Design a protein with these regions (language model features):
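Cytosolic nucleotide-binding catalytic cores of signal-transduction proteins
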Residues: 56-148
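Membrane-proximal linker segments that couple transmembrane helices to downstream signaling/catalytic modules
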Residues: 2-96
Length: 148
């Protein structure tokens, strides 16, 4: 249902050249709900315990790269659909952008994200800043937990 709605809105957005904030205002809550449900499912899987263990390491050099990639693969498996939705809705978002959003949403620490994405923490800070420009504030805040 959400995918059909997104496809319709994306079509009308492309035809009318309406700003993303406007065209997507009515489905932002549905996207956020889809994120929440996926997180609920992810948390119930064994891979989530692995994520929690890896998050305890506060030094990115001590994080096992293979384990970090395995957890990231688990995130990809769980959030593929919602990541695809975000890319359809917000055309400026890259695959890595939406994957980073999903990883942060499920609880990746800065250090773990740095290892999993093979990027410095500084590069990830810049990515987050670029993502903030691309997403409506309600979705950005829901993903990054900037508003309670």
């Amino acid at each position: 249902k959400l995918n059909l709605k997104i496809a319709r809105l994306t079509e009308s957005h492309n035809e009318n050249n309406t700003p993303a904030d406007e065209i997507n205002a009515d489905i932002q809550s549905e996207v956020i709900e889809k994120l929440r449900l996926n997180k609920e499912l992810f948390v119930s899987q064994p891979i989530y315990n692995r994520l929690k263990q890896l998050n305890l390491k506060r030094d990115s050099d001590s994080v096992d790269r293979t384990a970090a990639k395995e957890v990231l693969d688990g995130v990809i498996g769980q959030f593929a659909d919602v990541c695809s939705n975000l890319r359809q809705l917000y055309v400026g978002m890259t695959y890595d952008d939406v994957l980073y959003c999903a990883a942060i949403y499920v609880g990746f620490s800065k250090e773990l994200a740095s290892v999993a994405f093979g990027s410095s923490e500084d590069a990830l800070r810049r990515r987050k800043s670029r993502i903030k420009q691309k997403l409506p504030s309600t979705i950005f805040d829901a993903i990054f937990g900037t508003k309670v």
